[in-house]
Amino acid sequence: MDKISIQQLAETTRDLILNLILRINSIVEEIENTNGQEVFSNDRLNFILDDFFDLAEAIDIIQQQNSSISLEELTEKLNMLYDSMKAKDKFFFKDIAEFELKPLLEHWAKTIQFTGKH
């Protein structure tokens, strides 16, 4: 992939990451302000998981240009999130989303903006 394409992919991926962070905040808030069990029965989780798969595809390409981004980290955290969903454990889900996944995405949002610009 050429430099311009990598840069465009990085910009699009950063936008997706920022969107995912907002959606994680919304889900965490829903869990905190309600009994939170319905979080596992609505389509929002399916949509956000689809977007995480898209993110994983982009990260797989970007990590070749930016060594501070690793698909392995995302996979590990998504596996933990999936385990919490299978167990319908809203507190584990909230903790993984808020304290594991969100900080990783915030770090990537800062780091990824420089990918392809050198």
List the predicted regions and their residue ranges.
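C-terminal-biased regions
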Residues: M1-H118
